UniProtKB/Swiss-Prot annotation:
Biased amino acid composition, Basic and acidic residues: 1189-1198
Family: Belongs to the RNA polymerase beta chain family.
Organism listed in the record: Clostridium botulinum (strain Okra / Type B1)
Family annotation (Pfam families): RNA_pol_Rpb2_1 (PF04563), RNA_pol_Rpb2_2 (PF04561), RNA_pol_Rpb2_3 (PF04565), RNA_pol_Rpb2_45 (PF10385), RNA_pol_Rpb2_6 (PF00562), RNA_pol_Rpb2_7 (PF04560)
Superkingdom assignment: Bacteria
Name the record gives this protein: DNA-directed RNA polymerase subunit beta
Lineage of origin: Bacteria, Bacillati, Bacillota, Clostridia, Eubacteriales
Length: 1232
């Protein structure tokens, strides 16, 4: 039943029936842990891989001994970096040792290897002053993958792919004649026996003896025209290096370097782990029948007798003895299973080796050699340490290849299984740490080449490590990654939820991933292994659907990069649900039968029913209690954070829930945040983990609180912790970041207590919108097609008012003609325009500005003209003052207005770092309060979005029997066809809760049910159907039917009409076609396209059509003359020749066609090449402001689009071709 729950400082009444087992992990630990691993281990791995660098003679030896990030010499703090457009980074210092083997001389030096970007506590990076997020990438895991197809005769054809982390691929395939082929590194196919011969089994007899008798193998041998190892080697060499003279030696070294050289072929830990999982012998012989006695080679003891079934434990024992070949019986045939000879080291070594940190299987022959030659614990450990790369090879080894061939043969006997590449056991996550590591590796290997070259050139006596190392390639590759990788994105900072979701995003795109065009339907689809790992709901609509996902709430990423989800263990003896929590990967989960989290159990954990609903792989079954092995931990473990914030999600259609999840990320922070009356209980966790709220670092007592600082006296040592609050800062998206204290003086705070609210949070809970009194009622057609009718009260009381801050910058550069100057002294500008400009030429803080107002006065020197004698005389007398300058001041762009809230000035003199050629940089911040207005887009949390169609006076809105007018009217027709019934339940519950004064938590899949809502309505004194009589505000008459009325949580989205509305009379024109530009950013016109021309033609509106195609567009002289005529009040002149006609003529001439324009008398009409002389006579500039909008604006625009789901760089729209309407993409094209 309903019970109170404390979340932060607020009590919510919860309808949850299940008690939560286990904590939700920190929501941004994906980012933090990964970067942490990189600094601790990842960097070291790269140095280990590249050590030592030797010159070509092998005499000089360069080694990286150790490294440290110098955290004490970080230049600027995070806030300063944002202000100064610099990168938040620490210098990486590496200790390098150079050994000269001839002289035995050793030189050690500490070498600076560039500034390394650091992750902030919030999991972001500050790169050039912009906050960026590195998105985790979902890629195919390295390993062996088998597939099966059925050909037209109905026979099964098996194929396989061996995928390394980097290096040559091996692909096996069977044709319909039962011949198995191999492709090495995507070349032409060869019979597989050629590969086996080249690796060491040269003759037919050796192959058959090793792999066993098999039809397909024999067919392949017949097809194979080589008979010895040498022939096979030469054949492979011819295929891989066509045109080079083949020799056996070069062929051998080619194969060695292709597969068995750790520098060229890398499986990585994950690959080795997946190989052993797939090829280890114990997994393949379990539950098979032995065809011969299996004998322990050390003791001679018979482990399994012929004809006996091999169970799991026996199989593991067989593997641990070092047995790698087992004959098993399949339908009266004997088949030989060959493993890859890897064993679990812990079963063979009697002492504790946990300090060696070996988690994978190890190669048995090497281990046996060590155990045979050494007896005592210390020396065995020492040898294992020395031979770790032989025990756990990073590259593929011959045994692996034999085992993969054997697996391919075994599949036709139904031993083994085929793989599903969309299964999350076969896809892994590359998080920040690994992406950085790969990038760093690229940089280091480039550097290695430079070092080797320098070693040969420089004098070996005086050489030092510092002189050898060039850090350029390393620094450049890191910089390139953060600045321009598809996975390094401009953080979506619209509100705390969008920040959090961005950090938890999983993308299948990017380098080494899929591309949008190639990704088929299967990759994008929801898969049963996504359960509890990836959200099935939250993904963008549009071309990226299913390629960009979100991590589920309880998911974690393990050391191999596989996503894990937690389950409760069921005690196998008495079948009781314990509180033991086990994190499992998708592979492990497939082995078990798992019950739902809301399966009824009593307080001791025993199941109430005899039969239980369970999941087993992709099936949902009902099984007896005795078969259940695990149980879900929480009903919301399968969805992401944004989706878990939708109340009554279980009553919404999936596609609408998807829109709801995506639109919450676009909610603009409002002036006064308000937590939802009907929440789901995850709001507090989401806000605290998003990193926008300051938390107490230590327990203590608050001693001072003001709007911008909080001080806490620590309990431990009586010292003072100071917390500076952010006031009215601009976010990446131009929304406002403002923190307000929520603790008071004298309050005792524990560690991690929230001290202040941030944007869109209320008492530490995420508060994206407002609770609004609404009714489902149509009103005079103003609700047509999802439009919304709102009351003027929302405007008057600033309910949906938000603050937006824009940044503009002006820089004074050195030009060829002299330096630009920031000054108040601007030519041809009256005193009126300068009233808010101070003596430096910069606007004062607090000034109110409109579009066209000067923000920063700036003049640029004009070109010197040849001076006449008189002018030279004047110059000589009066000095330089008469020098020509033109006005290039920074002005407020069209359609913008507001109040100056901050001005920042950077100059060379103050020692600020400025780009080359810039002497002074001024930034102005303009804040505007945007009230809700017609054309703004609003939405609920259930995908019910609409645009405001009319603001109605309060007195005209429909009102309740107690006289309260509604605040919003929504169309009832928006509900049934869309099947998002959750909104109706939310409205009913909101009505009851507001009357009872409750805040409610109704968790997803475990929330209030219909009977609960009815009880609440009854308790609040409303009728059970939640409907009430409404009266018309204009007449006072009641409406015919009773109406559903209640409180709904409504968000104002970032698609604001002020940013979209746009008008132009004259403005900039395109250079070649002379047509007006398109789009608001270019201050363009509306395109009058082909179809619109047809419409005017159909009307026969000849004159209108003529002027649209000429003077309103690209008749250069005509448009100036027309403008002049309008100004002077004369008649409009005849249109001239449109520029596009001249372009057409030129294009035809470019095709070598002699095209001329003739008049009636066949006289050629000369089209003027240039219209400049005409235009000059007219002395009218109709391009409005001569200069086009500042580049700054365009940069902003690019930035805001950058996070837009990894747009590929090359999809630049041709702005001239698009109309404004096209630019204003579909509401949710991607996730704008």
């Amino acid at each position: 039943m309903v019970h109170p729950v404390q979340v932060g400082k607020r009590t919510r009444m919860s309808f949850s029936r299940l008690k939560e087992v286990g904590q939700m992990p920190n929501l941004i630990e994906v980012q933090l842990d990964s970067y942490d691993w990189f600094l601790k281990e990842g960097l070291q791995e790269v140095f280990d891989d590249i050590n030592p660098i030797q010159d070509y003679t092998g005499n000089l030896n360069l080694e990286f001994v150790g490294y440290k990030l110098d955290l004490d010499s970080i230049k600027y703090s995070v806030e300063e970096c944002k202000e100064r457009d610099s990168t938040y980074a620490a210098p990486l210092k590496v200790k390098v040792r150079l050994l000269n083997k001839e002289t035995g001389e050793i030189k050690e030096q500490e070498v600076f290897m560039g500034d390394f970007p650091l992750m902030t506590e919030q999991g972001t990076f500050i790169i050039n002053g912009a906050e960026r997020v590195i998105v985790s990438q979902l890629v195919r895991s390295p390993g062996v993958y088998y597939d099966m197809t059925v050909d037209k005769t109905g026979s099964k054809l098996f194929s396989a792919t061996v995928i390394p982390n980097r290096g040559a691929w091996l692909e096996y395939e069977t044709d319909s004649n039962n011949i198995i082929y191999v492709r090495i590194d995507k070349t032409r196919k060869l019979p597989i026996t050629i590969l086996a011969r080249a690796l060491g089994y040269g003759t037919d007899a050796e192959i058959i003896e090793f792999f066993g008798e098999d039809e397909r193998l024999k067919a392949t041998i017949e097809k194979d025209n080589t008979k010895t190892r040498e022939e096979a080697l030469l054949e492979i060499y011819k295929r891989l290096r066509p045109g080079e003279p083949p020799t056996v030696d070069s062929a051998e070294s080619l194969i060695e370097s292709l597969f068995f050289d750790a520098k060229r072929y890398d499986l990585s830990r994950v690959g080795r782990y997946k190989f052993n999982k797939k090829l280890a012998i114990h997994l393949r012989i379990t539950n098979q029948i032995a065809d011969q006695d299996i004998v322990n080679p050390q003791t001679g003891e018979i482990l399994v007798q012929k004809g006996e079934k091999i169970d799991k434990d026996k199989a593991i024992e067989i593997q641990s003895c070092g047995i790698n070949e087992v004959y098993i019986k399949i339908d009266d045939k004997s088949f030989k299973v060959i493993g890859n000879h890897f064993v679990d080291i812990h079963s063979l070594v009697s002492f504790d080796i946990s300090d060696l940190n070996i988690k994978e299987y190890v190669f048995y022959p090497v281990l046996k050699e060590i155990l045979d030659n050494y007896a005592d614990e210390e020396s065995i450990k020492e040898e294992i340490r020395k031979n770790i790369y032989r025990l756990i090879p990073k590259h593929i080894i011959r045994e692996d290849i034999y085992a993969t061939i054997n697996y391919e043969l075994a599949l036709s006997y139904d031993i083994g299984y085929k793989d599903d590449i969309d299964h999350l056991g076969n896809r892994r996550l590359r998080s920040v740490g690994e992406l950085l590591q790969n990038q760093f590796r690229i940089g280091l290997s480039r550097m290695e080449r430079v070092v080797k070259e320098r070693m040969t050139i420089q004098d070996q006596e005086v050489i030092t490590p510092q002189a050898l190392i060039n850090i350029r390639p390393v620094a450049a590759s890191i910089k390139e990654f953060f600045g321009s990788s598809q996975l390094s994105q401009f953080m979506d900072q619209t509100n705390p939820l969008s920040e959090l979701t961005h950090k938890r995003r999983l993308s299948a795109l990017g380098p080494g991933g899929l591309s949008r065009e190639r990704a088929g339907f299967e990759v994008r689809d929801v898969h049963h292994s996504h359960y509890g790992r990836m959200c099935p709901i939250e993904t963008p609509e549009g071309p990226n659907i299913g390629l960009i996902n979100s991590l589920a709430t309880f998911a974690k990423v393990n050391e191999y990069g596989f996503i894990e989800t937690p389950y409760r263990r069921i005690d196998p003896k008495n079948k009781r649900a314990t509180n033991d929590i086990v994190y499992m990967t998708a592979d492990e989960e497939d082995l078990y039968v798992i019950a739902r989290s809301d399966e009824p159990i009593d307080e001791n954990g025993y199941f109430i029913d005899d039969k239980v609903t369970v999941r087993a792989k992709e099936e949902v079954l009902v099984v007896p209690v005795s078969e259940v092995e695990y149980m879900d931990i929480s009903p919301r473990q399968l969805v992401s954070v944004a989706t878990a914030m939708i109340p009554f999600l279980e009553n919404d259609d999936a596609s609408r829930a998807l829109m709801g999840s995506n639109m919450q990320r676009q909610a603009v922070p409002l002036l006064k945040p308000q937590a939802p009356i009907v929440g789901t209980g995850i709001e507090y966790k989401a806000a605290t983990d998003s990193g926008v709220l300051p938390k107490a670092k230590n327990a203590g007592t608050v001693v001072y609180v003001s709007a911008d600082e909080i001080r806490v006296r620590r309990d431990s040592d009586g010292g003072i912790d100071k917390y500076k609050l952010l006031k009215f800062k601009r976010s990446n998206q131009g929304t406002c970041i403002n923190q307000r204290p929520i603790v008071s003086k004298g309050e005792v705070v524990a560690k991690e207590t929230l001290l202040a609210d941030g944007p869109s949070t209320d008492l530490g809970e995420i508060a994206l919108g407002k609770n609004i009194l609404m009714g489902f009622i149509t009103w005079e057609g103003y609700n047509y097609e999802d439009a919304m009718l709102i009351s003027e009260q929302l405007v008057k009381e600033d309910v949906f008012t938000s603050i937006h801050i824009e940044e503009y910058e002006a820089e004074a550069r050195d030009t060829k003609l002299g330096p630009e100057e920031i000054t108040r002294d601007i030519p041809n500008v009256g005193e009126e325009a300068l009233k808010d400009i101070d003596e430096r030429g910069i606007i004062r803080i607090g000034a109110e500005v409109r579009s066209g107002d000067i923000l920063v006065g700036k003049v640029t020197p004009k070109g010197e003209t040849e001076l006449t004698a008189e002018e030279r005389l004047l110059r000589a007398i009066f000095g330089e003052k008469a020098r020509e300058v033109r006005d290039t001041s920074l002005r407020v762009p069209h359609g913008e207005a507001g109040i100056i809230v901050d001005v920042k000035i950077f100059t060379r003199e103050n020692g600020d770092e400025l780009p080359p050629g810039v002497n002074k940089l001024v930034r102005c911040y303009i804040a505007q309060k945007r009230k809700i207005s017609v054309g703004d887009k609003m939405a609920g949390r259930h995908g019910n979005k609409g645009v405001i169609s009319r603001v109605l006076p309060e007195e005209d809105m429909p009102f309740l029997p107690d006289g309260r007018p509604l605040q919003i009217c929504l169309n009832p027709l928006g509900v049934p066809s869309r099947m998002n019934i959750g909104q109706v339940l939310e409205v009913h519950l909101g009505l009851a809760a507001s009357k009872l004064g409750w805040h409610i938590a109704t968790p997803v899949f475990d929330g209030a049910i219909e009977s609960d809502i009815v009880d609440c309505l009854r308790k609040a004194g409303y009728s059970e159907d939640g409907k009430t009589v409404l009266y018309d505000g204009r007449t006072g008459e009641p409406f015919d039917n009773r109406v559903t009325v209640g409180y709904m949580y409504i968000l104002k989205l970032a698609h604001l009409v002020d940013d979209k509305i746009h008008a132009r009379s004259t403005g900039p024109y395109s250079l070649v076609t002379q047509q007006p530009l398109g789009g608001k950013a270019q201050f363009g016109g509306q395109r009058f396209g082909e179809m619109e021309v047809w419409a005017l033609e159909a009307y026969g509106a000849a004159h209108t059509l003529q002027e649209i195609l000429t003077v309103k567009s690209d008749d250069v002289v005509g448009r100036v003359k027309t403008y002049e005529a309008i100004v002077k009040g004369e008649n409009i002149p005849e249109p001239g020749v449109p520029e596009s006609f001249k372009v057409l003529i030129k294009e035809l001439q470019a095709l070598c066609l002699d095209v001329k324009v003739l008049n009636d008398d066949n006289q050629e009409i000369k089209l003027k090449e240039s219209v400049d002389e005409d235009a000059d006579e007219l002395e009218v500039n109709i391009e409005g402001t001569e200069n086009q909008p500042e580049e700054k604006e365009e940069k902003e625009k690019e930035d805001s689009d950058e996070y837009d789901d990894l747009r590929e760089e090359d999809v630049e729209p041709d702005l001239e071709e698009l109309s404004l309407d096209d630019l204003d993409l579909d509401d949710f094209g991607d996730e704008h």
